[in-house]
UniProtKB/Swiss-Prot annotation:
Upper lineage: Bacteria, Pseudomonadati, Pseudomonadota, Betaproteobacteria, Nitrosomonadales
Entry's localization field: Cytoplasm
Binding site for GTP: 14-21
Name this polypeptide is given: Urease accessory protein UreG
Predominant location: cytoplasm
Source species of the chain: Nitrosospira multiformis (strain ATCC 25196 / NCIMB 11849 / C 71)
One GO biological process term: urea catabolic process
Amino acid sequence: MNKQSNPLRVGIGGPVGSGKTALCEALSKRMRDRYEMAVITNDIYTREDMEILLRADALPPERLMGVETGGCPHTAIREDASINLEAVARMTADFPELDLILIESGGDNLASTFSPELSDLTIYVIDVAGGEKVPRKGGPGITRAALLIINKIDLAPYVGANLEIMARDARKMRGERPFVFTNLHTGEGVDQVIDFIVKQGLLDEVRSQHHHA
């Protein structure tokens, strides 16, 4: 990874209901003791995702910020990311020691991506309930995200989705880029996601610079 912002900014995208908020919660709870973290959520008209994270005690309330994007959630992370860049700047000013900010996009479709000025590493979350064809449908989230997460693998038998076919299609669409199968309710696969963020985002280097500065 060439571009390194301080703190590391990880964009989390994916369709409504795929598990973006559940991922933010799981990452926060497993990483908060080791890294200084904050989360910014994007919702169309409410701050519902931020409220979910608050109720789950994912992070202290002052480290959670909800951005209301209005009618076009993808615009707020892509064409005009200023509302999110402003939120990042405020969080960084409030917590200068931050190592990591997770930015959860509003419910979007397969075509939305994060602006490179907003996100250093992008994770795209889809779920098995969408059907095994989702990886092969492609779209920038599936083909270009640094990491693809295929969530809710426990539902595969109920929706007739074959995980081997999904894995094969994900490899075909993504080439060398990695993907992970997860069940965010049980925590299965979360360690692989954390490992990816730490290594690809050079998080331990960021942390040692911060804490020895």
